[in-house]
Amino acid sequence: MKILGIDPGTRNCGYAVIEKTGNKKTLIEAGLIKIKQDSLQYQITQLCEGLDIIFKSHKIDAVAIEDIFYAHNPKTVLKLAQFRGALSLKILQIHGEFSEYTPLQIKKAVTGKAKAAKEQVAFMVKKMLGINQEIKPLDVTDAIAIALTHSFNVRIS
């Protein structure tokens, strides 16, 4: 089963494809959809084009995204919500469904602690997948953690 984890953002969108075979999880690909600072419409287009490439490159069985988080700046929340809406629509058009996890659920699934620091999440992601090199940036680590969280919550049919 191939799982796509997505960490939505307005500047960079982290993504990771992992494969789950029984209890074994393997990282297939991870990276960023880089979003150039331009008009909102163009930024959303970049995000959707990046998703198209990922879906065309892999036979994805499941998609998981991080649920929207609270931000202090209302403009940031609004922009992220617009990105999230476009992201959701694109996934539904291509794949048909997706699962959502809050940051606390992801941290708890990966580290055992809902209030874990990002560095703890990064450490556990590397440990779980047997990766020795550093994974950067944290958007990518978060996307891997999202995919792993879904892998713990799904049964292979």
Curated annotation (Swiss-Prot):
Binds 2 Mg(2+) ion per subunit. It is an enzyme of class 3 (hydrolase). The keyword Transcription regulation does not apply. This is Crossover junction endodeoxyribonuclease RuvC. Keywords: Cytoplasm, DNA damage, DNA recombination, DNA repair, DNA-binding, Endonuclease, Hydrolase, Magnesium, Metal-binding, Nuclease. One of its GO terms (cellular component) is Holliday junction resolvase complex. Mg(2+) 2 binds at residue 66. The active site is at residues 7, 66, 139. The gene is ruvC. InterPro entries: RNaseH-like_sf, RNaseH_sf, X-over_junc_endoDNase_Mg_BS, X-over_junc_endoDNase_RuvC. The RuvA-RuvB-RuvC complex processes Holliday junction (HJ) DNA during genetic recombination and DNA repair. Endonuclease that resolves HJ intermediates. Cleaves cruciform DNA by making single-stranded nicks across the HJ at symmetrical positions within the homologous arms, yielding a 5'-phosphate and a 3'-hydroxyl group; requires a central core of homology in the junction. The consensus cleavage sequence is 5'-(A/T)TT(C/G)-3'. Cleavage occurs on the 3'-side of the TT dinucleotide at the point of strand exchange.
